[in-house]
Structures are given as structure tokens and as C-alpha cells.
């Protein structure tokens, strides 16, 4: 909503203690007694009621007082709304947070965010303290961002809870089967690159973000939907567009007063588009699923072993059967696409831009890839052994994470931090990611160094922390703790396979006049969508494992 009350929608300084307890003070004396029936109450009962009320009031007023935290970006004295500061937050959130820690070093403070309102920003050192706190809810925060109870928003609800079928499939099938999906990813990369990057051996230019989005959509869909659907143009269009459309729809609905959202969304073009895309997704996926179910039923009736597919369609079927539950296939598949495709393609774009600006590292990467894959190709340990490539990914994510804050949560109960700060129930909070650019933590933190984490591995005890998929308060690219990105292991494999093919098969450089300028939108941090590159197919002989 446009109007913003720093004390929150439940706050009203004129309310009395009796009103807070649900008793209006507009009735007094005998009139109040008559209305409530107290005139007929035995004196002892009346005294007990009064005593109970007094005890309740004393308990409420003597409870722990919330810490009054400073607001780094408050409205001006004569501003009636927070519209101006919200607009500033949308374009300059990183600088607002930086200003907060300059004014209040090492201390929590509040900021007004355009997406969820008043938010407590915690220093990075609090990441380990709160990472697994059961009183802090990621689900409640997501409920503030999206409106998953509304038609068309269902994929944003999937994955909120630990026992959701989407999260369970990621943990129990996708991550466990990483070694089995490497070759399918490689085969699809071969086909997709011919279509998207082309086999043109002459220099030609392309929009980097666009070609990477198309590539990652193909690779992800190969694992999520299998060979039959991963090249389906209708599905690829839906899976790329839905994420953008649902975010636009949610942003529009946040401007609408809460009670009206259930009505307004029916007429909102962005929400209508989301509903349409969910329906279209079902029309693409359900016929394939029904075909598989019929095939399995036939084979089982004939006493034959049912066909097993190595994709998420199969995994969802197995998980639903084991849980004895039902699910919407289009919803869970759009959930996977929403959390995977745009974030992965964004990082691939950032990495390729970093490599183009640091071309001296490309040959060492090619040498590592050739060395690792020379003996046996895509083995189980192949991607793990590419330590320089792993370092490059982690370094690019360090300098340009997907957001400038991480671990966004809502306190479901009162919370007392180790420094004594008391945060009341309902507090929305986030941990600043600025330690990733802290000169006290990293040497030359603003400079991209692809060897940074390779070198860190040589420090005793640091090998684990140097891995791309590891999380800590020093590197919050994937979050930290219980709700750290569960799909980061798949993203790592997908990115490494894609980059192996790109680096070995293509030369690329920034197009003339291109200046890389990644974009902020509130706390989000996006790869520059305007980057153009020159690329060409390399005329080199490659081992057969690059064609399979």
C-alpha cells in the first residue's frame, strides 16, 4: 500500500490497554454493566474479573520491550507517505544498506523496503546465529512477497514447506542423481548450442542474456521434463515467461489493500497472464504424464518391469506414490522452473561477462577441462575435479550475487539476539551480504579473481569453504543454514556442463562499445540485460564425449 506506518498496521498509539484486550472503553458505569451483564454478577466474581484484567495488563506492560532500532531511510518530517523512500530503495538499496552500516557499524537497523515494508537488517555475523532458528520463518516472508493462495500463483507456494513434494524431490532425487544426469545434460548442451549459439565459425554478435536464458531453459527442461518435452516450444516459452510474469503480478498486487486483492487479481492483466500460463503448462505436461501412466499400467498387467525415466516427471510420480498423495504436475514443474532457470542463466551471463573481461584465464580453464575429461569423459567425479572452474563460479557469484541481502525471514515469536537486541513477533528481517565485498575478509574485494578460491583451497581447513556450493557468513550467495538454496548442487552441475561446452567449442568476447553494468531492483541484483558478445565456433577437434 502507498501509506506506510512505521509501527505497522497493528499499531495505534491512541489505543488503551482495555481496547488492546478487546474491551471497548466507550461504555462506562451502569450502562457498561447492563450491556455486559455485570450488574447481575456476584461481587466475588466481579472482583475476580477485575483482578484478571489487572494481571493481564500488568503482564503485557511488564513484558520485554522491543528494541527501538534506528531507521536508515525514514520519510521526511512533512511527508505523509513513504512513497519517496520506497522509490529510492528500488533503485539504490545497496547504497542505503551501506549507509546504514556506516552510521550503525556492526549493529542491526531498520530500513523501509518497497516490497515488504519495514525490515530489520542484520550484520553478516548474525547469519550463523539465526540460520537454523525455528522461530524464523522463510515461509511467512514468502507469503509477504507472493500471494500463493490466489489462482495462477500456485507454483510460488510449492517448496515453501520442508515436506512439500517439490522440495522433497529436489533433495531426494535431483541432488542424489547428479552423477546420472551429467551425460544427459551434456547431450542436450550439444544440441542446444547448435541451435542457439550456432555452428557459425565467423564472428557474429548476440545478446548474452538472451542466448543463455534459452540455453538454460533447454538444459533444465531436459532434466525436469525429459527428452520428449525439453525442446517443446510452447513449454519453453511458458517456462521462461512465467517467472517474470508472476513477479510483475505480485508487485502490482502489493499496491492493492489486502482485503481487495482477492477481487482485484481477477481483473489484473498480469495475474490473468499467470493463470493462463499455468493452464497452458498443464496442457503440455499432462498428456505426456498420462501416456507414461498408461504404459506402466500395461507393462505391470503383463508382468513386465515398468519403464523408468530419469527426469523430474518420473521423480514426482515416485514421490507422490510413496507419500500416498496427489499433486498438480504443472504446478510442481513451474515451481522448478521458477527457482532454477532465471537464476542459473543470470549467473551464467555474469560468468561469461567476467571471462570476456579477463580472457587470460580462458586457456587455463580449457586445459583443466581437457585434463579432467581426457580419461573417461563424464565420470562421477569429473565436475568435482574442475576446481578452477568451480572457483570462477564462486568468484562471480561473490561479486554479483542474486541479491544484496540474504536469509529474509519473519519472526514467528519474540526473538532476543546475542547482543541483547529484542525483536518482537512479526518482525521482517534480512542479513546483509556486504561481507562478500569486505576488505577485512577478502584481498582486493572489488576485483574479480578467478583463482581466488583455488588459492584458498591451499589453506589448511579451507577446502570445504572454498567450494562453489558451500555457504557461510562470508559468502551468502546461496543463503545459509536450513533454507540455503537446495538446488545449488544441480545448478553447479548444469553451469559446469554448459561452460565446458561453451569454452571448448566457442571463442567469445565483448562486442565493441559494450560496458557491463549489472542492474539493481530493490534488494535484487540482476545481470546486465544489454550485454552483447561476439562469438564464433572454434575450428578444433574435440573428443567424442563433447558430442554425447
From Swiss-Prot:
Question: Which InterPro entries does the entry mention?
Answer: Cyt_P450, Cyt_P450_CS, Cyt_P450_E_grp-IV, Cyt_P450_sf
Per the UniProt entry, what is one GO biological process?
secondary metabolic process
Any matching Pfam family: p450
Q: Which residues bind heme?
A: 485
Report the transmembrane regions from the record. Answer: none
Q: What happens when the gene is disrupted?
A: Abolishes the production of heptelidic acid.
Q: Which cofactor does it need?
A: heme
Ordered alphabetically, the record's keywords are:
Heme, Iron, Metal-binding, Monooxygenase, Oxidoreductase
Q: What EC number(s) does this enzyme carry?
A: 1.-.-.-
> Could you give a GO molecular-function term held by this entry?
heme binding
Give a yes or no for keyword Lipoprotein in this entry.
no
Q: Does the keyword Kinase apply?
A: no
Source organism superkingdom: Eukaryota
Q: In which pathway does it act?
A: Secondary metabolite biosynthesis
Q: Which Gene3D superfamilies match?
A: Cytochrome P450
SS bonds (residue pairs):
none
Query: Which protein family is it in?
Result: Belongs to the cytochrome P450 family.
Annotated protein name in UniProt:
Cytochrome P450 monooxygenase hepE
| Organism, as annotated | Aspergillus oryzae (strain ATCC 42149 / RIB 40) (Yellow koji mold)
Amino acid at each position: 500500500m502507498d501509506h506506510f506506518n512505521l509501527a505497522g498496521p497493528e499499531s495505534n498509539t491512541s489505543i488503551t490497554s482495555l481496547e488492546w484486550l478487546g474491551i471497548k472503553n466507550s461504555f462506562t458505569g451502569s450502562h457498561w454493566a447492563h450491556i455486559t451483564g455485570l450488574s447481575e454478577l456476584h461481587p466475588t466474581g466481579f472482583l475476580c474479573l477485575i483482578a484478571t484484567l489487572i494481571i493481564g495488563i500488568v503482564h503485557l506492560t511488564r513484558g520485554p520491550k522491543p528494541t527501538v532500532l534506528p531507521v536508515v531511510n525514514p520519510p521526511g518530517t512533512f511527508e505523509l507517505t513513504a512513497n519517496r523512500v520506497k522509490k529510492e530503495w528500488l533503485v539504490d538499496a545497496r547504497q542505503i544498506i551501506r549507509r546504514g552500516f556506516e552510521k550503525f557499524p556492526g549493529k542491526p537497523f531498520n530500513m523501509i523496503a518497497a516490497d515488504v515494508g519495514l525490515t530489520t537488517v542484520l550484520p553478516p555475523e548474525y547469519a550463523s546465529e539465526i540460520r537454523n532458528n525455528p522461530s524464523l520463518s522463510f515461509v511467512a516472508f514468502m507469503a509477504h512477497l507472493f500471494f500463493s493462495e490466489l489462482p495462477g500463483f500456485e507454483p510460488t507456494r510449492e517448496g515453501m514447506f520442508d515436506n512439500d513434494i517439490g522440495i522433497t524431490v529436489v533433495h531426494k532425487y535431483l541432488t542424489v542423481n547428479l552423477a546420472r544426469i551429467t551425460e544427459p545434460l551434456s547431450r542436450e548442451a550439444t544440441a542446444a548450442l547448435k541451435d542457439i549459439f550456432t555452428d557459425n565459425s565467423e564472428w557474429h554478435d548476440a545478446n548474452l542474456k538472451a542466448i543463455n536464458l534459452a540455453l538454460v531453459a533447454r538444459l533444465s527442461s531436459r532434466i525436469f521434463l525429459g527428452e520428449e518435452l525439453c525442446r517443446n516450444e510452447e513449454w519453453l516459452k511458458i517456462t521462461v515467461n512465467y517467472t517474470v510474469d508472476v513477479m510483475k503480478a505480485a508487485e502490482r498486487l502489493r499496491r492493492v489493500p489486502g482485503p481487495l486483492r482477492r477481487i482485484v487479481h481477477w481483473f489484473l492483466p498480469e495475474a490473468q497472464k499467470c493463470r493462463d500460463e499455468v493452464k497452458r503448462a498443464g496442457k503440455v505436461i499432462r498428456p505426456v504424464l498420462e501416456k507414461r501412466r498408461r504404459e506402466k499400467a500395461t507393462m505391470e498387467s503383463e508382468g513386465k518391469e515398468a519403464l523408468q525415466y530419469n527426469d523430474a516427471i518420473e521423480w514426482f510420480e515416485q514421490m507422490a506414490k510413496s507419500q500416498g498423495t496427489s499433486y498438480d504436475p504443472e504446478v510442481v514443474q513451474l515451481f522448478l522452473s521458477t527457482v532454477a532457470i532465471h537464476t542459473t542463466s543470470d549467473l551464467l551471463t555474469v560468468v561469461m561477462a567476467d571471462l570476456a573481461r579477463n580472457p587470460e584465464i580462458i586457456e587455463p580453464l580449457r586445459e583443466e577441462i581437457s585434463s579432467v575429461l581426457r580419461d573417461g569423459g563424464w565420470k562421477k567425479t569429473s565436475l568435482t575435479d574442475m576446481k578452477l572452474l568451480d572457483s570462477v563460479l564462486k568468484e562471480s557469484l561473490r561479486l554479483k550475487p542474486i541479491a544484496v541481502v540474504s536469509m529474509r525471514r519473519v519472526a514467528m515469536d519474540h526473538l532476543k539476539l546475542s547482543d541483547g537486541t529484542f525483536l518482537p513477533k512479526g518482525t521482517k528481517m534480512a542479513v546483509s551480504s556486504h561481507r562478500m565485498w569486505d576488505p577485512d575478509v577478502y584481498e582486493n574485494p572489488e576485483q574479480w579473481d578467478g583463482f581466488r578460491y583455488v588459492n584458498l583451497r591451499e589453506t589448511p581447513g579451507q577446502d570445504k569453504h572454498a567450494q562453489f556450493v558451500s555457504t557461510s557468513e562470508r559468502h551468502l550467495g546461496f543463503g545459509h543454514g536450513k533454507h540455503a538454496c537446495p538446488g545449488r548442487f544441480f545448478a553447479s552441475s548444469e553451469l559446469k556442463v554448459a561452460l565446458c561446452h561453451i569454452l571448448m567449442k566457442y571463442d567469445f568476447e565483448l562486442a565493441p562499445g559494450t560496458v557491463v553494468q549489472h542492474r539493481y531492483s530493490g534488494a535484487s541484483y540482476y545481470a546486465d540485460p544489454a550485454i552483447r558478445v561476439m562469438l564464433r565456433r572454434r575450428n578444433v577437434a574435440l573428443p567424442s564425449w563433447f558430442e554425447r
